[in-house]
Regions:
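Mid-domain beta-loop-alpha active-site segment that forms a flexible
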Residues: 39-40, 47, 89-93
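Structural/interface elements that position substrates and couple domains in central-metabolism enzymes
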Residues: 27, 44-48
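NAD(P)-dependent Rossmann-like dehydrogenase/reductase catalytic/cofactor-binding core
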Residues: 13-16, 23-34, 56-57, 62-160
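Glycine-rich "substrate-gating" loop/helix at the edge of Rossmann-like oxidoreductase active sites
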Residues: 7, 35-40, 57
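A general alpha-helix detector
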Residues: 1, 47-51, 96-101
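Conserved phosphate-handling catalytic cores of large alpha/beta enzymes
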Residues: 1-10, 14
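AAA+ ATPase "lid" subdomain C-terminal helix
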Residues: 45, 55-56
């Protein structure tokens, strides 16, 4: 997926040509209006903010959270978009749950204190050998290779 974001002066012809190019290289163009961070990052960062809030408050540890997301919503969202999920579950269900749950979700405008603490200690993630988790160079190589292989497999399954 590649976000196609035309400016105010961008012609329809240019947008169509960009979308055609995206399709030719094997991706799905998604046309949208400009918004800070673009749509994909905004959705990702909303998820990350809530995940970090749950860890910061001691509701769940990082390992449990990764398992929960990987085998819960991540697994589901690989095959159905959020708007389709709403229709499948029922808008009345979303309304009932959202009426009490939305008020308890994180609305913080700040970066997680956990993240800031880790950065302050020089723990920037895999590139420094550790962030939330610790990594050896061999583990990093294995994780990156496994991720690439799984992404290819998921893409093939979605295209089937």
């Amino acid at each position: 997926m590649i976000e196609v974001i035309p400016g105010e002066q961008t012609s329809r012809e240019t947008v169509d040509a960009a979308s055609a190019l995206v399709r030719r290289i094997g991706y799905h163009p998604v046309e949208e209006r400009e918004v800070p961070g673009f749509v994909e990052n905004r959705i990702l960062y909303a998820i990350l903010r809530e995940c970090l809030d749950l860890v910061d408050r001691g509701i769940i540890d990082p390992e449990g959270l990764d398992l929960n997301v990987r085998w819960g919503i991540g697994y589901k969202l690989a095959v159905i978009g959020p708007m389709e999920l709403l229709d499948m579950a029922g808008l009345d269900i979303y309304d009932a749950v959202g009426s009490y749950l939305n008020q308890d979700l994180s609305t913080s405008g700040e970066v997680s204190s956990t993240i800031r603490d880790l950065i302050g200690r020089g723990r920037l993630g895999m590139k420094t050998g550790g962030g939330i988790y610790d990594y050896t160079p061999e583990q990093i190589d294995r994780l990156r290779a496994a991720r690439a292989g799984k992404l290819v497999a998921v893409r093939k399954a979605l295209e089937a």
